Every structure is written in structure tokens, then in C-alpha cells.
């Protein structure tokens, strides 16, 4: 049987400091969030500085992820906020640690 790579898909909600929300879908959440953070492509998220990962869900099937993305995009803002705040009440950037440089351990002789 040939090797078959497993895929996963993420539906995510990004937010800005001012509270602007953006919903998207991707097959590589870490890479996609990094694109939003460094504004490597123009558009809505770059214009409104929407680069904080507030919420995400993982799906095995792309069709399920797209269906969920469309569902969330159809929700009123209040319902989206309730979804975020259920798991992330302080609106912390869930990707913050993904992009920080690794901690460097200092040895006694380096101090």
C-alpha cells in the first residue's frame, strides 16, 4: 500500500488590538498565522493589523473545515465573541510562543 500523508485543516479566528475579527481556513495553521503576522500579503488583515490568533478548530476533512468557516462567517459578532471567550476569555494570542526565539540557557562560565 502506498504511503498516504495525513492532512489536517484549521478554521481560525484572528483579532486585532482594536477588536477587528477575521475568520479563515488553512491546511498549515502555523505558516498561515506567520503570514498574517508579517503582513507578507496585503488585504484585510494587513490593513487592519489583524494578527492575533484567538481561536481555532482542527478538522480532518477540508470540506468540514470549509463548512465550519462559512458557518462562523455567517454568525453575528456577538456569537463569535462568545465562542472566543468560552476558551480564551482574555483574548490572548494563542500563537505567541510559536514565534518567539528559543530561550538560551546561560552556563556559569558565561555569566
Residue ranges and their predicted role:
Residues 70-83:
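Short arginine-rich
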Residues 1-41, 46-56, 66-67, 87-89, ...:
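GIY-YIG nuclease catalytic motif and its immediate N-terminal context
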Residues 29-30, 61-63, 77:
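Residues at or immediately preceding the N-termini of alpha-helices
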Residues 58-73:
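Mid-chain, well-packed structural core segment of small domains
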Amino acid at each position: 500500500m502506498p504511503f498516504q500523508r495525513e492532512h489536517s485543516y484549521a478554521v481560525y479566528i484572528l483579532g486585532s488590538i482594536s477588536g477587528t475579527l477575521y475568520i479563515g481556513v488553512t491546511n498549515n495553521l502555523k505558516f498561515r498565522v506567520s503570514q498574517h503576522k508579517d503582513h507578507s500579503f496585503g488585504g484585510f488583515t494587513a490593513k487592519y493589523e489583524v494578527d492575533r490568533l484567538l481561536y481555532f478548530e482542527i478538522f480532518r476533512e477540508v470540506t468540514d473545515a470549509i463548512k465550519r468557516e462559512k458557518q462562523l462567517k455567517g454568525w453575528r459578532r456577538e456569537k463569535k465573541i462568545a465562542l472566543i471567550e468560552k476558551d480564551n476569555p482574555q483574548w490572548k494570542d494563542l500563537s505567541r510562543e510559536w514565534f518567539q526565539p528559543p530561550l538560551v540557557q546561560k552556563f556559569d562560565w558565561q555569566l
